[in-house]
């Protein structure tokens, strides 16, 4: 089964790969996000996560929560909590469960902040 990330006009699409080595290494965490924010409202959002389950999966609950919500710190923090509950990553030689969870939360916040032109140092 494939995961299709649609690209819409005025949307921002970014992907992040976190691994020990950038080249030729399996990701510890991968995230692709596509969204459109209009007048501070999240009008469209797609979030795909890798490294948090057996195969890459859509973060359906986080997407559903963020859709048509005001872009603010409170909603970002709630979406991070949802991501944590939505996935149950494994511990392996690439990364621990806690590391994968924290990185996925940080990447979501980083994307949303950068998309709204707020500088971020989160990984």
Please annotate each region the language model reported.
Residues 1-123:
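C-terminal structural segment of proteins
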